[in-house]
Amino acid sequence: MVVVRRLRQSLVDEYGKEIYSLLKSFADVIGYSFEDEEEIKIEFNPDRPDLFSIPTLVGAAKIFYYNEPIVRSLFQASEIEVAISEGVSFIRPYFAGFVAEGPSIGSKLDDLIDYQEIIHQTVGKERKKVSIGIHDLDKTEPPFRYTTISKLERMKTYDSFEGTIEDVLQKHPKGMAYSSLLPDSRRVPAILDKNGGILSVPPIVNGIMTKIEPETRKFFVDITGMDSNSVKYAFYLLANFFQSSKYRISLPKIKGSYGPSKKEILDFNFRPYRLNLKYVSRYLGDKVSEENVILNLRKMGYVAEPGYPEVMVYVPGFRVDVMGLVDIIEDFIKSYGIENVREQYVSPGTIGSPNIFNEIKEKIRDVVVGLGFQEVMTFVLTGKYYQEDFQGEVRIENPKSEDYSVIRDRLYLNLLDLLARNKKHPLPQRIFEIGDVIVHGKQETHLCVMVEDNRSGVSTSKSILTSFLKRFSDHESKISGKKIYGCIEGRSGEIFLSGKSIGVIGEVHPSTLENFGLVNPISFFEINIQELIDQHQ
């Protein structure tokens, strides 16, 4: 989740009293949470990065409620030049940039810096794919160069840390956090001005020379990265912030660019889609008029033009979340109002019957509850703790958050994370989960039973496993010693039923407990329910 904060009085002072109620109502349309305190807290799902700042959110709300038209504005050409050195192609090859000119940034400075960091975390994947530098153009002199420089060069960072770039990488907080994104080399990427002054060392830190202040009116924004599309997305998100704040955007002349090209950037803005009204009606379950579709899409920030039986829809560049017609229809329904969608009774063509697999899962659930355990549910998508030994083979290609970047391949790590989040509860903690995982590309349903107690060892889970199997299966079980990821060697093993492997059992290693911030002993067993059912039948 992405959180945006602003003092309520500051919001009212800048945008007027009506904007407060406007944003509160807009939450029901978009689907964000709005916490009404002295400091307003707005919490978003990660699917609308164009709204993750107060100026862009206010702009979208005004378009929706005041029917302010979207202008298909074109970027102007700037006389500023940026030369791209061939050396950066091996380190951080992609570059885009723009110039923004307008009023003094004033109180929006904090909004801008917060939005920059949000883009770093979301689109930029913690600066791995994209990093952004924002500079006061009046404090420097173009043309600029995106090139490489020696780590022995000296610089002064935006917060007055002074030393060699090597010092910055090793001692400055930003350097220590992000130096791993650069290859082990004697040179680093840098953006220099006409006189060789260092504007920034991407993706690490900006120099003090072009530090932005509330009085700044002219900005030069550099966007560098490892992924061309991500650089393009960040370009439009930042450009939208400035345009929402009444700034003019112009594009510098890029020499030697490795992409995205100027044409790629311009073509992404107001990209066209043909939306058939029958297609909309099929999703809505009711007939809609061309006028209705156009009105509601314009309220959601699209350019929509008649062309019966199709509507021509042009998607602004900052709507990086829109990947096809279904996304456009979803926005139409949000504007149309989900409460206005007519309910219909769909008569089933068959007679229902219980799913046998689900019935057996219920029996398993009853048995484990009877053994004194509480059921929990964790996310199928995960990522944070799968740095080693990941066997799922299913990763999200473009995750909104690295914490939800893979489909889990086991349950016990998720349960450890859950226990770590509930340390305030008294011991013992006896929990279980029945859930889907993917192992080596195959979907399986697992049962994981876990005990946290000051005396919990593998023998604890072994006795629980024995009791469980006796209540559910008459077949002979056996545990064969095996090293299990995250467990103590010699206190973990593989579970066999009638000679066939059905799961694993183990006592969690102290180092694993430490990684999760846990201190008490934990043991568990995890079995494949399908294998258990096959033995049961």
From Swiss-Prot:
It holds the Pfam family tRNA_synthFbeta. Keywords: Aminoacyl-tRNA synthetase, ATP-binding, Cytoplasm, Ligase, Magnesium, Metal-binding, Nucleotide-binding, Protein biosynthesis. The keyword Cytoplasm applies. GO terms for cellular component: phenylalanine-tRNA ligase complex. Mg(2+) binds at D321, D327, E330, D331. The keyword Ribosomal protein does not apply. Signal peptide: none annotated. It is found in: Cytoplasm. Its cofactor is Mg(2+). Its EC number is 6.1.1.20. Its main location: cytoplasm. SMART domains: B3_4 (SM00873), B5 (SM00874). InterPro entries: aa-tRNA-synth_II/BPL/LPL (IPR045864), B3/B4_tRNA-bd (IPR005146), DNA-bd_dom_put_sf (IPR009061), Phe-tRNA-ligase_IIc_bsu (IPR045060), Phe-tRNA-synth_IIc_bsu_arc_euk (IPR004531), Phe-tRNA_synthase-like_B3/B4 (IPR020825), Phe_tRNA_ligase_beta2_arc (IPR022918), PheRS_beta_core (IPR041616). It catalyses: tRNA(Phe) + L-phenylalanine + ATP = L-phenylalanyl-tRNA(Phe) + AMP + diphosphate + H(+). One of its GO terms (molecular function) is ATP binding. Tetramer of two alpha and two beta subunits. Belongs to the phenylalanyl-tRNA synthetase beta subunit family. Type 2 subfamily. This is Phenylalanine--tRNA ligase beta subunit. It comes from Thermoplasma volcanium (strain ATCC 51530 / DSM 4299 / JCM 9571 / NBRC 15438 / GSS1). The gene is pheT.
